[in-house]
From Swiss-Prot:
It catalyses: D-arabinonate = 2-dehydro-3-deoxy-D-arabinonate + H2O. Belongs to the mandelate racemase/muconate lactonizing enzyme family. This is Arabinonate dehydratase. Gene3D superfamilies: Enolase-like C-terminal domain, Enolase-like, N-terminal domain. Keywords: Carbohydrate metabolism, Lyase, Magnesium, Metal-binding. Mg(2+) binds at D199, E225, E251. The keyword Lyase applies. One of its GO terms (molecular function) is hydro-lyase activity. Optimum pH is 6.7. Induction: Expression is strongly increased by growth on D-arabinose, both at the mRNA and at the protein level. Disulfide bonds: none annotated. The gene is araD.
Length: 373
């Protein structure tokens, strides 16, 4: 039985000098900020989840504490599907996407953590998976006043030296010509055997995305992520049809219903989603299985804390995803939240075989990284 639900708003300020196109354009500039959810059962099990809503963590926290928590107290924590539906239906009139789903995401992941701990099995095995390693690509190439072309080349060369065979670079904040020069400089240093993807973070118009896509085709780019605003699915479908470079997205979509429309309209070639805001592990599994039926690869997105990274990893292992996204820029909410170190082996993330998520929250970490406001 669910005894208590606690939430913690956590902040890390150390990555503000590296920015994507949205931040450069003044549309989304926030510190790394997550909401961690802690669920305790009457028989002493504790599970953890993570939610992300840039700049809106207070609203996520209130949603969990004031709306979701009263629905869940004294419920059977093992009835995860029932509890997901109960939360979704209770927030239907004002939720369905965004903040409410981000809150549900953290709760759902925490419930799966508990389920694994009670069963003494890792989550990926509860989901039917067998994959012990998932190949990772590294997202970098953020814009920074401190990063000239030479430093950009050094950064990407470092990722390859560590054994990663795929990288992703931020674009969209500079002119197309400047971004193409950045990509050419990276290709020179990483060679032809490393996959290079790009991420525009939704900043282009359709016409701009089409023009940039034509340029990216000539460079052999692996995929073009979130070229335009997520809402313009018909236009994204036109891009996917007209461009040779695969369109990837849209991590900013929520739940199986929105992803059904994305796939039905063939708005992407590669599906990307994330446990921290699409509805948790339960919903991401539904999206992943739907992608299999409709012929799409699913590559999990990642950009926040350690709990969501490991949640994504378990789902990727269960779905046999070909890749998973990873970051290596300094982020204490990823690197210092667990007692154990996240295991990387020759460019792959190792799926933990310990119960639940398989990682232990470090004592005092929620107090240490508690947001100041």
């Amino acid at each position: 039985m669910i005894k208590d639900i606690r939430t913690y708003k956590l902040c890390y300020e150390g990555i503000n000098d590296e920015r994507d196109a949205l931040a450069i354009k003044g549309l989304a500039e926030h510190p790394m900020e997550i909401v961690a959810t802690e669920i305790e059962t009457s028989d002493g099990y504790v599970g953890y989840g993570e939610s992300l809503a840039y700049g809106c963590s207070d609203a996520v926290q209130v949603t969990i504490e004031k709306i979701l928590k009263p629905l869940l107290l004294k419920e059977d924590e093992e009835l995860i599907e029932y509890l997901w539906d109960k939360m979704y239906k209770a927030t239907l009139r004002f939720g369905r996407r965004g903040i409410a789903i981000a809150g549900i995401s953290g709760v759902d992941t925490a419930l799966w953590d508990i389920m694994g701990k009670k069963a003494k099995k890792p989550i990926y095995k509860l989901l039917g998976g067998s994959k012990r390693k998932v190949r990772a690509y590294i997202t970098g190439g953020y814009y920074s006043e401190k990063k000239d072309l030479e430093k950009l080349r050094d950064e990407e060369a470092y990722y390859v030296k560590m054994g990663f065979k795929g990288i992703k670079v931020k674009i969209g904040a500079k002119s197309m010509e400047e971004d193409i020069e950045r990509l050419k400089a990276i290709r020179e240093v990483v060679g032809e055997d490393v996959k290079i993807a790009v991420d525009a973070n939704n900043v282009y118009t359709f016409e701009e995305a089409l023009e940039m896509g034509r340029r990216l085709e000539k460079l052999g780019i692996w995929f073009f992520e979130e070229p335009i605003q997520t809402d313009y699915l018909d236009l994204s479908a036109r891009l996917a049809e007209e461009l040779e470079v695969p369109i990837a997205g849209y991590e900013t979509a929520y739940t199986r219903w929105e992803f059904y429309e994305i796939m039905r309209k063939r708005a992407v070639d590669i599906v990307q989603t994330d446990v921290m805001w699409t509805g948790g592990i339960s919903e991401m599994m539904k999206i992943g299985n739907m992608a299999k039926v409709m012929g799409y690869p699913l590559i999990p997105h990642y950009s926040a804390g350690g709990i969501s990274l490991i949640g994504n990893l378990h789902v990727a292992a269960a779905l046999n995803s070909p890749w998973i996204e990873m970051h290596l820029r300094k982020n204490d909410l990823r690197d210092k939240i667990f007692k154990e170190s996240i295991e990387i082996d020759n460019g792959h993330l190792v799926v933990p075989d310990r119960p639940g998520l398989g990682y232990t929250i470090r004592d005092g970490v929620f107090e240490e990284y508690k947001c100041k406001s």
